[in-house]
C-alpha cells in the first residue's frame, strides 16, 4: 500500500499497520523513527518496497517500529472456527483504511515440513559448494531459514555457465561470497573479470576478483 501527498507524485509508505484478530489487537507497527544501527533490519520488514510483513522473522532484531506483537505475529489456528481478521492502515495525518477477512480453522493432520534442495539456516554459517559453483552465507546474514535450488545453463556469451538460484536469495544483512569457475579463461588482464546479475535480457555488474 502507498500513501500519497497532495501536490506531488511521491509515494510514501503506510505510517501505521494494525492487525486485529477477533477484535483484539494482535500485531501493530508504527513507523516514526528508528536508530541507525537498525537500518538494515528494515529489509526483513519491507521486502523490495512491495511487501510489509506482519510477523517478525527470527533473525530480525528491529525493535523500534513494533508497538504490540503477539507471538512474533504468528497466529496459531488451533480451533475449528472462523477467526475474524482485520487490517487497519493509517497514514501520517490519521486517515485510515481497513480490510476484513476470515480464517477458517479445520481439524487436520499437520503437514510435514518439506526441505527440497539446499537448506540454509539464519543462525549458523552456511556453505554450499558443488562442481563449479560455491556460495557462503555467514550466520546472521539471513533473517530466516532459506530453502532453495541451484541449476546451471551453458553459455556461449559469458566466460562461465549461467547459475540460477530459485527462489532468489532475499536481501541479506551481511555480505555473502559467491565463487564461479570459468569455462573460458581468455583475458590476459585478469582484473577485467567480474560477476554479473542477470535480469531478463539485461546484465548488471556486481563485483568480483579473479583467483586461480
Residue ranges and their predicted role:
Residues 76-82, 187:
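Surface-exposed, short loops/turns at beta-strand junctions within beta-sandwich domains
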Residues 111-122, 149-200:
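Proteolytic processing hotspots in large secreted/extracellular or virion-associated proteins
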Residues 2-9, 180-184:
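Short amphipathic, basic-aromatic surface patches that mediate peripheral association
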Residues 12-76:
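Exoplasmic/lumenal beta-rich domain surfaces
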Residues 211-212:
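C-terminal beta-strand-rich structural cap/linker in extracellular carbohydrate-active enzymes
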Amino acid at each position: 500500500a502507498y500513501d500519497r501527498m497532495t501536490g506531488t507524485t511521491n509515494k510514501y509508505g503506510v505510517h501505521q499497520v494494525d492487525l486485529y484478530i477477533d477484535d483484539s489487537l494482535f500485531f501493530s507497527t508504527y513507523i516514526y523513527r528508528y536508530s541507525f544501527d537498525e537500518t538494515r533490519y528494515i529489509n526483513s520488514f519491507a521486502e523490495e518496497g512491495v511487501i510489509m510483513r506482519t510477523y517478525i522473522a527470527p533473525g530480525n532484531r528491529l525493535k523500534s517500529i513494533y508497538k504490540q506483537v503477539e507471538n512474533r505475529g504468528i497466529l496459531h489456528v488451533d480451533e475449528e472456527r472462523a477467526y475474524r481478521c482485520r487490517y487497519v492502515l493509517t497514514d501520517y495525518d490519521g486517515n485510515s483504511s481497513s480490510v476484513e477477512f476470515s480464517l477458517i480453522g479445520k481439524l487436520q493432520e499437520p503437514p510435514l515440513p518439506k526441505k527440497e534442495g539446499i537448506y540454509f539456516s539464519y543462525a549458523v554459517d552456511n556453505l554450499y559448494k558443488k562442481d563449479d559453483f560455491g556460495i557462503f552465507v555467514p550466520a546472521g546474514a539471513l533473517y530466516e531459514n532459506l530453502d532453495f535450488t541451484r541449476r546451471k545453463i551453458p553459455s556461449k556469451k559469458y566466460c562461465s555457465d549461467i547459475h540460477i538460484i530459485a527462489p532468489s536469495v532475499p536481501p541479506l544483512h551481511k555480505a555473502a561470497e559467491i565463487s564461479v569457475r570459468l569455462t573460458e579463461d581468455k583475458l590476459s588482464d585478469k582484473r577485467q573479470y567480474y560477476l554479473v546479475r542477470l535480469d531478463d535480457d539485461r546484465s548488471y555488474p556486481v563485483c568480483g576478483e579473479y583467483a586461480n
